[in-house]
Amino acid sequence: MRTAIFADLHDNYTGLTTVLEDAADQKVDRFVFLGDAGHQPRILAALQVRKIPCVYGNWEVSGLRRFPEALAEWVGAWPAILHEDGIVYCHASPDMPAALPTTAVAADWMKPGMSWSALFPRLHQNTNAVWNALAWMETHDVTIAFHGHTHVQMVWVWELATNQLRSFASLERVRLAPGTRTIVGVGSAGVPEDGPWPRYAIYDDDARIVLMRCLRDD
């Protein structure tokens, strides 16, 4: 199965349609969205009508009460993570508090003055958070984690036998190797910070390959 994973639209409807069109050209079988859609109802409606599985990000938590009632009920039920066989999808890190399973619960829990970074760390700037994510993956027997939030594409590969952690930017393809745990930052479809073009990832679980898509105009 080929899964297109994208994140961080931040009200960029053109970014959404660009990713959807490219992914269709790449013959993906399904989509997963990793949070921070924005506050435009039409973006949320586009995700909803396509029945795209979504996890919540900080924008959903902070903006939940701005949405129309029907959308708020749907977004409020988004989970913190999607955990499949050997795979996890999350906004910032899979190491999320078990007490915050949905957007609505997280929105009720957050109070003024609380640190967003504690709940949504930026992995490319926080090595401890990377190791916490890898520890969660090891505990839950997860081989690969996909995340957004950082707005950059980046990959971490932890080799279990040597305890060596390597990070990579600007990769076009990642092949999952035995005896490793891999974290993939899919980049931003709406507001990328590693260039002006929308970015996302495609995971082919049969080939065990991740394609890092960068949608240049040319």
What is the predicted function of each stretch?
Residues M1, I87, R181:
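Alpha/beta-hydrolase fold active-site loops
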Residues A23-V28, E84, E138-D141, I202:
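Glycine-rich phosphate-binding loop signature in dinucleotide/nucleotide-binding domains
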Residues P41-F146, T150, M154-E159:
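Conserved catalytic scaffold of divalent metal-dependent phosphoesterases
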Residues R30, I52-N58, Q164-A169:
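Short hydrophobic/aromatic-enriched beta-strand-loop microsegments
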Residues A4, I144, W156-D218:
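Acidic, His/Gly-rich catalytic cores of divalent-metal-dependent hydrolytic chemistry
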Residues M1-R50:
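N-terminal active-site segment of His-dependent metallophosphoesterases
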Residues A7-L9, G35-G38, N58-E60, A92-P94, ...:
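Active-site metal-binding loops of divalent metal-dependent hydrolases
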Residues F33-G38, R122-A129, L160-E172:
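A short, flexible low-complexity segment enriched in Lys/Arg and Gly/Pro that occurs
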